Amino acid sequence: MAAGKEIKSRISSVQSTRQITKAMEIVSSTKFKKFQALVNQSKPYSGSMDKVLANLAAGIKNERHPLFDGKTEVKRIGIIVMTSDRGLCGGFNSSTLKEMEKLIVANPDKEVSVIAIGKKGRDYCKKKDRDLKAEYIQLIPETMFDKAKEISENIVEYFYEDIFDEVYLIYNEFISALSTELIVKKLLPIERIEVQDNTTYIFEPSVEDILSSLLPKYLNIQLYQAILENTASEHSARKNAMKNATDNAEDMIKDLTLQYNRERQAAITQEISEIVSGASAL
């Protein structure tokens, strides 16, 4: 029964692993529900900001602003890449970082700097010797809005100071518990969304002052929403990965148990045969 003992030991090992993956699945499920609620709460406000900016842009088509118009020549690109702090979430981080590499490869003649949100992105950039402009790790719900505000203020400052000529954002958009979409979005210059709006606006004190106040706030909301959606997507991916691992462990335990019972039955049958043979010889 040496083989049986090995199988029994393997069953015990897989059972221990299953307990760990099940616990992680429960924790991830709880965190996912929390961030799913935050995403749903924030989305209407983010959508309203999109509409306000679109209507405003339609009403000032002839007005110019640096955050709208961009630079005449693009030499330096900033990439904000959002990953997780921890692993065990399937291909969540690897697909995001592959998309970042595609964007870098697509701009061989430009200087590229990265703002990493999440340890996995930070560690990857350090390993690959990418120009890491800033890093933000271990974000918690209570500070996410303030961090988004800090990042948006920094990229606007970098844009005005010609440190960045364009800024891109890479993150996972949350769609449902089973579906997310990897998004690559140009943050700066801000795209003028085309809408049919013939409304005439009167600006006080001036268009320049209003845009200078509104556009950074718009970027702040865009980044905050992206952080929430990316975090919800992360916990969804980890929950699903741990569920798959738990299911696989349960299947493995069933197979090993069946194998153990067969080995045990074969050993018992062998012993009975030997006893019968011995009795016949007598």
UniProtKB/Swiss-Prot annotation:
InterPro entries: ATP_synth_F1_ATPase_gsu (IPR035968), ATP_synth_F1_gsu (IPR000131), ATP_synth_F1_gsu_CS (IPR023632). Produces ATP from ADP in the presence of a proton gradient across the membrane. The gamma chain is believed to be important in regulating ATPase activity and the flow of protons through the CF(0) complex. One of its GO terms (biological process) is proton motive force-driven plasma membrane ATP synthesis. Keywords: ATP synthesis, Cell inner membrane, Cell membrane, CF(1), Hydrogen ion transport, Ion transport, Membrane, Sodium, Sodium transport, Transport. Its main location: membrane. F-type ATPases have 2 components, CF(1) - the catalytic core - and CF(0) - the membrane proton channel. CF(1) has five subunits: alpha(3), beta(3), gamma(1), delta(1), epsilon(1). CF(0) has three main subunits: a, b and c. Pfam families: ATP-synt. This is ATP synthase gamma chain, sodium ion specific.
